[in-house]
Curated annotation (Swiss-Prot):
InterPro entries: PsdUridine_synth_cat_dom_sf, PsdUridine_synth_TruA, PsdUridine_synth_TruA_a/b_dom, PsdUridine_synth_TruA_C, TruA/RsuA/RluB/E/F_N
NCBIfam families in the record: hisT_truA
Name of the protein: tRNA pseudouridine synthase A
Subunit composition and interactions: Homodimer.
Broadest EC class assigned to this enzyme: isomerase
Catalytic activity, EC: 5.4.99.12
Function: Formation of pseudouridine at positions 38, 39 and 40 in the anticodon stem and loop of transfer RNAs.
Active site, renumbered: 52
Length: 245
């Protein structure tokens, strides 16, 4: 029996996050059900990260064992045929038994989509956070640069987050403009629960209120949750890629 790595993509709109819940639809639950139909036995899926309710992924990584002999291309086809169209297996490969999607990950990349144009089609806001006021991308990037390096992100953590250390290393953070969208891209060692959404919500709030950009640095350095601003909605957040090198 070999361990298999799967790269998966999903639209999280109709799911209560990645992690399995007994009475609610989740990404993990749907994938495990499909694998169990194929293998006729219980299958446990492990992931690189547990995305929240409503969050999407282009490059989530999972691993599992399956107790049947089947070519990977046939297994991929079989799994996708049993999944809803909003969850897709992108690729499969064999990995060593020691491989752990979460603990072997070196970095993770997230993107957050902001719709910043009043003249848009209704569906353009389905997976983007609509902000009516014109945002100054230079000011946004001044604040994004303050994230680079190792920081205590207690300010941008959720009270329910039980992680012992709030220290995280951020390698890259920037806002870029693409047509009607402003896209925030961030790469870090790992992230706290709702951390990216809290960062985005706080930066946008400071920009909308035209506060000095150093306000963001003061909020970050406060290490106090009460100073965080709005938590941006989940529907605009994507887990893009997990890096293992």
């Amino acid at each position: 029996m070999k361990k298999i790595l799967a790269e998966i993509a999903y639209d999280g709109s109709l799911y209560y996050g990645f992690q399995i819940q007994p009475t609610k639809p989740t990404i993990q639950g749907e994938i495990e059900k499909a694998l169990e139909k194929i293998s006729k036995t219980k299958v446990k899926v492990h992931s690189a990260g547990r995305t929240d309710k409503g969050v999407h992924a282009r490059g989530q990584i999972i691993s599992f064992y399956i107790r049947i002999n089947i070519k990977l291309k046939n297994l991929k086809t079989a799994i996708n045929s049993l999944l809803r169209k909003d969850i897709r297996i992108i690729k499969l490969k064999y990995v060593a038994d020691e491989f752990q999607p979460r603990f072997n990950a070196k970095r993770r990349k997230y993107s957050y989509y902001i719709l910043n144009n009043e003249n848009h089609y209704p569906w353009e806001g389905y997976q983007a956070y609509y902000v009516k006021k014109k945002l100054n991308i230079n000011r946004l990037n001044e604040m994004a640069k303050m994230l680079i390096g190792i920081h205590d992100f207690t300010t941008f953590s959720c009270i329910k987050d039980q992680t012992n250390s709030k220290l995280k290393k951020i390698y890259f953070a920037r806002f870029k403009k693409k047509n009607k969208l402003i896209i925030f891209e961030i790469i870090g060692s790992s992230f706290l629960w709702k951390m990216v959404r809290s960062i985005v919500g706080t930066i946008i709030d400071i920009e909308i209120k035209n506060e000095p950009v150093y306000t963001f640095k003061k909020i970050l350095n406060s290490k106090n949750r009460k100073f965080t601003r709005t938590t941006a909605p989940a529907k605009a957040l994507f887990l893009d890629k997990v890096f293992y090198e």
